[in-house]
Amino acid sequence: MKIVVLDGYAANPGDLCWDELHALGNCTIYERTAPTEILERAAGAEILLTNKTVLTAEHMAQLPELKYIGVLATGYNIVDVEAAKERGIVVTNIPAYSTDSVAQMVFAHILNITQQVQYHSEEVRKGRWTQSKDFCFWDTPLIELRGKKLGIVGLGHTGYTTARIAIGFGMKVCAYTSKTNFQLPPEIRKMELDELFRECDIISLHCPLNDSTREMVNAERFRMMKPTAILINTGRGPLVHEQDLANALNSGIIYAAGVDVLSEEPPRADNPLLTAKNCYITPHIAWASTAARERLMQIMLENIKAYQEGKPVNVVK
């Protein structure tokens, strides 16, 4: 069975092992694959594994041996799932492997912004604490989380884990979710989306990207938010209209943003968020802890074995 990994470097840049995958078939691993290289490299493969390399209906039409696409991520919008279904190609993803790591990054951004960790560390290096007349030094507001409202948009695995951490900080947690009140713990209050944007001090995005959520956070919703509000996005970049976010930050409509994802990655040099006021950006690393990537690799193997046994799991519908 021919197995091809189109872009293995992101999941395994060399610190993990591919040996167990090689044991499952005749396996070829490419670090990265350009769009023009897909058909040549995938020719004859029954199994294709992809992290971010886009697979379209046109690709599938020219790969008659292809029977299985394994997405090495939770989000699967890089694959034309309907086209795969029409051709009888099984598509699987890797659910929940990075839940704890992503929730951890949510709070890395929240704590950096509310405590101004990066800023004060840089100011100490400039000598400002050394020059201080007092034992301590700060010159920006420091925000305590207890009692603040955290609004979570999308209460899946990561959203719920984020909520539990927030409760540990003494925050009030609100959620926009399809779950009913009976399905929610009493510590989480269900809200409509606009109500959540109006009332919450910090808003964290955890919903999937689709036609109804694309650029759902835009100028209209920024105008609903408090001027002290903080937006966190570790979900998908296109959930947010980036120019509108930059405008909201630069004009003081909202206070700050922490983002780990952008609409185009890597970003163009003219992306407005790169120079926006109080915008803290990490380069799509929330998912990439060693522990999370080890889980990803293990679930990848389990998915392939289940497919080979005729009982596929984690199938994308």
Feature annotation, model-predicted:
Residues 1-45, 308:
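N-terminal glycine-/charge-rich "phosphate-binding" loop or analogous flexible N-terminal tail
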Residues 31, 72-73, 89-100, 177, ...:
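Short beta->alpha connector loops at strand-helix junctions that form conserved
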Residues 45, 63-66, 200:
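An anion/phosphate-binding loop that grips the pyrophosphate of nucleotide cofactors and donors
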Residues 54-61, 179-272:
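Rossmann-like adenosine-cofactor binding region
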Residues 87, 96-149, 316:
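Phosphate-binding beta-alpha-beta segment of Rossmann-like dinucleotide-binding domains, i.e.
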Residues 91, 172, 228-317:
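Rossmann-like dinucleotide-binding domain for NAD(H)/NADP(H)
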Residues 158:
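Hydrophobic/small residue at the entry helix of a nucleotide-binding pocket
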Residues 168-184:
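NAD(P)-binding Rossmann-fold cofactor-contacting core
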